Amino acid sequence: PISSFFVAGASKRGWTTWTTAAVDSRVIGMAPIVIDMLNVTPSMHHHYKAYGEWSIAIEDYENYNIMEWMNSKEYDKLLKHVEPYEFIEKFSSIPKFLINGTIDEFFVTDSWRFYWDDLKGVKHLQYVPNGNHGLRGDYYNMTLKNLISYYYRVINDIKMPILDWKVHKDSVYVRIDPNQKYSISKWTSNNTKERDFRIWKVGDSSWVQSKIEKNNSGSYVFLKEINEGYTAGLIEVEFNGIEDFPLKLTSGTWIYPDTYPFKEYKPEPPLGTPLLSD
C-alpha cells in the first residue's frame, strides 16, 4: 500500500489538491497550481471589484447563477464542506508550494492576500511572470522543472530556502538568508487604464524583469512604482544551492494603487436565504 505521497494539480485539480491534503494523512507535500481562490468569498468579491464583471473564463459558473448564491445561508453551509480554507489548520504540517500565473484568465493576480497570512507551517509561493492559466509554452516547462525541484527537496527532507516577504502600504520588504546562493529580480507590469492584468488585457509579455544587485545582509526594501493607471509587481528569487535543482520562489504580487474601480457585486435578485435574516 502507498504510505505517503506528494499531491499536485492545476486548476480544478488544484482545488482537489487542497481537499486531498485536508483529509488524507499520507500527504507529505502539496502543490496547488493556478487555483488562486482560497477563501473563495472575499476572493470573488475582490474579482468583481477589480473587473466590474465576472471574467469570461468563469462564464459557465455565471450561467448557472452560482454567484447569485453568495452571502446566503445555503452557500455558506456548502462552503463549510467543500472550501479548503475551512480546513486551513489541516495544512500546517504539510510543505505547501502554491504556483499561480500573473496573467491568469480566471483569478486576480493579488488574491494571495485573502489566505497567505493564515497558512501556517512550511509554505512557499511562485507567481509565474507572464504565465496564464495554462502556464503555456516555455512557462509550463519551467514551472514543471521548478515543481520537481520543490518535490525533490520534500522527498529527500532537504531544508527549504528561507525567503520572507511582506507587502505593506507603499513598500515591499524582503529578507533572504545571505548564506544561501541566490539571485534576485523584480518583475513589473503596467496597465494604464484598468486594474486588470489578464492576458487579453496586457498581453503575454507585459511583465518585465529587472535584476537586483545582491547585498550582504539579504534584506531589501522596494517602493511600489507610481505610474499611469495600475502597476503590478513581484519579487522573484532563484536559489541555486542544489546542482540541477534550482528553485524559484516569489513574493505575492502587489498592485498599486491598491484601490478598486468598481463596487462590490450585488445579486439582483439574490438567491437563497440571506445570512442576516432571522
Label each region the model flagged:
Residues 182-189, 195-197, 232-235:
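Beta-strand-rich binding/interaction modules
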Residues 149-188, 205-218, 223:
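Surface beta-strand/loop "capping" patches
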Residues 1-11, 26-27:
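Gly/Ser-rich "nucleophile elbow"/oxyanion-hole loop immediately N-terminal to the catalytic nucleophile
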Residues 7-9, 31-33, 99:
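Short beta-strand immediately N-terminal to the catalytic nucleophile in serine-hydrolase-like folds
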Residues 74-131, 169, 173-184, 191:
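Serine-hydrolase catalytic core
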Residues 9-19:
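Glycine-rich nucleophile elbow surrounding the catalytic serine of serine-hydrolase chemistry
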Residues 228-242:
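Short, aromatic- and glycine-rich surface loops/edge beta-strands on solvent-exposed regions
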Residues 19-68, 126-129, 134-142:
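Hydrolase active-site cap/lid region
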